[in-house]
């Protein structure tokens, strides 16, 4: 495994007001004189210099006239400052969420390519938190718990008492990602019933025969099929759920793909 470190991101950022102050000092102006030239109060200029108030379009126009740099320059400076500020604030939040990683199968997610492979050391953990947020598509661990903890789905588990919520949620999300890449017609109940009858006739066939035919039959009936390798500690054989009112998903973990257990799980979920 190639071990990467998190990308460099400085933990400091200068407010655009620093540039305003530098240009004013080059001209030998005090903050009071600068305020007078810009038509602002000294308090407002002090807040602008210290990053307490943003450079608005109006302020950028005034700075262009008084200090010479273009309005676009000042607005871009402000936008970059706000972006870096937001990134630093997010990093601080991520530091508070590091314990969330203990609930997730981070190693398995890295191995599967779901999140980037980096060394799972203290300095990289905030970045891993961000990768996991993006993978699950949630704003914070609280939303993750609310979404995946409250999902009303019918699980078939091999060991209920040993199942891990973090591992199950990761497996479910991997299935969602597979489904997101699939398209097809809306769900057709009659076609699905017909598909199940034909699929029952495939149970004695090897995977290379039954799998493509099975996918085609389900696709034509508007049913998505996701075969997702099992994740340790999830102990989930299969799950059936609706991703939307017209998009049902059957997700199987490939436990016993070549024996009766695979088919038992499929027909249980179907």
What role is predicted for each listed range?
Residues 2-29:
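A short, Lys/Arg-rich alpha-helix, primarily the initiator
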Residues 38-64:
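Recognition helix of helix-turn-helix/homeodomain-like DNA-binding domains
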Residues 21, 32, 61:
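Residues within the helices of the helix-turn-helix
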Residues 65-98, 104-114:
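Short amphipathic recognition helices of helix-turn-helix/homeodomain-type DNA-binding modules
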Residues 24, 49, 59-60, 67, ...:
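DNA major-groove recognition helix of helix-turn-helix
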Residues 3-6, 149-270:
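Conserved binding/catalytic microenvironments
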Residues 32, 43, 72:
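Key DNA-contact positions within bacterial/archaeal DNA-binding proteins
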């Amino acid at each position: 495994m190639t071990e990467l470190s998190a990308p460099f991101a400085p933990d400091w950022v200068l407010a655009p007001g620093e540039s305003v102050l530098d240009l004013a000092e080059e001209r030998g102006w005090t903050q009071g004189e600068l305020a007078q030239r810009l038509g602002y109060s000294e308090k407002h200029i002090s807040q602008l210099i210290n990053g307490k108030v943003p450079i608005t379009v109006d302020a950028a126009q005034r700075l262009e006239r008084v200090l010479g740099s273009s309005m676009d320059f000042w607005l871009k400076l402000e936008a970059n400052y706000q972006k870096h500020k937001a990134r630093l604030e997010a990093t601080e939040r991520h530091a508070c969420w590091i314990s969330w990683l203990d609930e997730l199968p981070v190693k398995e997610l890295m191995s599967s390519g779901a999140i980037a492979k980096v060394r799972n050391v203290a300095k990289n953990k905030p970045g891993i938190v961000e990768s996991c947020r993006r993978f699950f598509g949630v704003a914070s661990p609280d939303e993750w718990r609310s979404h995946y903890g409250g999902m009303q789905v019918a699980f078939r588990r091999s060991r209920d008492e040993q199942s891990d919520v973090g591992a199950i949620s990761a497996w479910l999300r991997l299935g969602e990602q597979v489904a997101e890449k699939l398209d097809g017609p809306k769900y057709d109940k009659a076609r699905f019933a017909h598909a199940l009858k034909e699929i029952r006739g495939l149970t004695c066939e090897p995977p290379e025969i039954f799998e493509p035919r099975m996918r085609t039959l389900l696709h034509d009936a508007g049913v998505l099929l996701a075969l997702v390798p099992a994740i340790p500690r999830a102990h989930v054989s299969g799950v059936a759920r609706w991703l939307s009112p017209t998009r049902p998903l059957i997700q199987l973990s490939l436990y016993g793909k070549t024996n009766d257990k695979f088919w038992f799980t499929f027909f249980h979920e179907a």
